[in-house]
Design a protein with these regions (language model features):
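Alpha-helical scaffolding within the catalytic cores
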Residues: 1-4, 52-59, 87-90, 140-143, ...
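N-terminal binding-site loop/beta-alpha segment at the start of enzyme catalytic domains
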Residues: 1-68
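Acidic (Asp/Glu)-rich catalytic clusters
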Residues: 6-7, 33-35, 55-67, 89-98, ...
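Active-site beta-loop-alpha junctions enriched in small/polar residues
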Residues: 20-22, 45-47, 73-77, 105-108, ...
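Short, acidic/polar
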Residues: 22-35, 80-96, 116, 141-144, ...
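Beta/alpha (TIM)-barrel catalytic core signal, keyed to glycine-rich beta->alpha loops juxtaposed to Asp/Glu
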Residues: 108-185
Length: 185
């Protein structure tokens, strides 16, 4: 699991553990075991309601936090721009860490101003509590909007991708923009 993809001097491991639908002691145990067997990328989100268990699993593993690439996401369906900083700080507290490697916009909505949201998230990055900003479930239109708004340094786009959903047009756009594809299935 040593292969990784790098951008802006930050490497993301090629295989990660997604924690969607993991809860309670099972989540904590799975995260700990994954790290013990060599996983170094753990993906969670406030929407998954398991950040506390993920954080405990990381602590329980004994793996140095600097060796773990940790991703979480801002839930744009419930958090509006004025609540992003508080939501992020709650995620840090739940995860028992003072930074995350990657912060994503989770499930974009059109009721939120994308430019304002990215501006706030990049402000969090400036505080060094986040190493990279990315997006999740963005289509080509939304990626183009990021560029139009001046946010050309999006680290990655986490999207559903598998043999039954190839996303070739989206992957081509991401390649043109030098945005790392992160797949879930």
């Amino acid at each position: 699991m040593s292969r990784s993809f790098s951008r802006f001097g930050l490497s993301i491991p090629s295989i990660g553990l997604g924690t969607w639908e993991l809860r309670g002691r099972k989540c904590r145990r799975v995260v700990r075991k994954a790290l013990e067997v060599g996983y170094r990328h753990i993906d969670t989100a406030a929407m998954y309601e398991n950040e506390s268990e993920v954080g405990s699993g990381i602590v329980d593993s004994g793996v140095d936090r600097k060796e773990v690439f940790l991703t979480t996401k801002i839930d744009t369906t419930t958090v509006k721009n004025e609540g992003i900083i508080d939501a992020f700080n709650q995620s840090l507290s739940n995860l028992k860490t003072d930074y995350v490697d990657l912060l994503l916009i989770h499930w974009p909505t059109f009721s939120t101003n994308l430019g304002d949201m990215l501006e706030i998230m990049y402000g969090i990055k400036e505080s060094q509590k986040v190493r990279a900003i990315g997006v999740s479930n963005f289509n080509t239109t939304l990626l183009n909007e990021c560029t139009r708004l001046g946010f050309e340094d999006i680290y990655c786009n986490q999207v559903e991708y598998h043999p039954f959903l190839s996303q070739e047009i989206l992957l081509k756009k991401m390649n043109e923009m030098d945005v790392i594809p992160v797949a879930y299935c």
